[in-house]
Amino acid sequence: MQTQNAPETAENQQTDSELGRHLLTARGFHWIYGTSGDPYALTLRAESDDPALLTRRIREAGTPLWQSTTGAWVTGRHGVAAEALADPRLALRHADLPGPQRHVFSDAWSNPQLCHIIPLDRAFLHASDADHTRWARSASAVLGSAGGAPAEGVREHAGRVHREAADRTGDSFDLMADYSRPVATEAAAELLGVPAAQRERFAATCLALGVALDAALCPQPLAVTRRLTEAVEDVRALVGDLVEARRTQPGDDLLSAVLHAGSSAASAGQDALAVGVLTAVVGVEVTAGLINNTLESLLTRPVQWARLGENPELAAGAVEEALRFAPPVRLESRIAAEDLTLGGQDLPAGAQVVVHVGAANRDPEAFLAPDHFDLDRPAGQGQLSLSGPHTALFGAFARLQAETAVRTLRERRPVLAPAGAVLRRMRSPVLGAVLRFPLTTSA
């Protein structure tokens, strides 16, 4: 696998004027549809509207599955959401669109498609279920599988990185900038075996990739979109070089594991590239988000934070409850591969189905006192976070990092407390991404 110049992707072929017009048109439709009060369209605006109110409105709509003015079929009910996420007929891409998942607004008023704002195929975000299943199987020895834990080496590295990060914090620090993102990025770099000389480049690339999951559904500013597409090509080149090196010098890293799990050299190399790219695109952001959301849920409830000091074993339950209460990925979008019936509605092939995971995870029909963050909530109640194909790949890894963060900060910074409000990124309906969360270690 030789590193090559970035190919002419759909975005690279467009002038700034063309791409900017495309993004503004999609953004305009979200605003127009939102004027009717459509809660999903307002969610996609991701501006100043109350996300908790919109989440409740999506869940409490008149029917379990309803059609938004955007054209998408939306559900916030737990039963329908679980059914949709488990249905193999609902895929990440259009069955009749074999190339990049991109829709041009040539006659947008007739039937605008807002399911793939920009194509992210080169980031492997629109791959098939079969591909994701194969990648998960080949990566499981290192990343862990559903219900399983990551490799012991991954656990040992997590403990060391989190201790070092906690010890670097002063009397006040920002959770995202000074802790969550650095440890998530460093953990991902270690997974891939990124050389020390390349880690600064890797961190900068991951930062630009952080908007990817949001950009699929919510148009980002032109400059941000350009940086994203450039970062995708940069991480492909970086990971491609690592994969080539592992062919002759394998190690105990994730890429080596995937290479040696493949049935052929060609397919194994492509699988390793995909898993490596997804680690940077999805793994880092989901992990950083889960760390932030778990600690925010605990630190804004001092009694719960104090309980962790008395019983550190509650850390795993705190992470699982945070996945339900404040999921790091709020929206999951799918495309019907064939005509099907879901939630009492007949959907044609090509229809977009959106699961609002945050709404479904607070469905009172599935959870007792769903708006209460409960460290003692029984496990196995069916929270739906990290059940998408690419997010599930990093489920065990993200849980490990978040649990380690909780344990480490509770031990080393026991009087940790918020020093201001959480500031979230605009245009982040999928992740609800945190920009800043100031903390103080002084009583």
From Swiss-Prot:
Q: Which Pfam families match?
A: p450
GO MF terms here are:
monooxygenase activity; oxidoreductase activity, acting on paired donors, with incorporation or reduction of molecular oxygen
Protein transport found in the keyword field: no
Source taxon at top rank: Bacteria
GO aspect biological process, one term? antibiotic biosynthetic process
Q: Which CDD domains match?
A: AknT-like
| Alphabetized UniProt keyword annotations | Antibiotic biosynthesis
Q: Which family does it belong to?
A: Belongs to the cytochrome P450 family.
**What role does it play?**
Involved in the biosynthesis of the anthracycline antitumor agent aclacinomycin A. AknT is required for the glycosylation of aklavinone aglycone by AknS to yield aclacinomycin T (rhodosaminyl-aklavinone).
Name it: Protein AknT
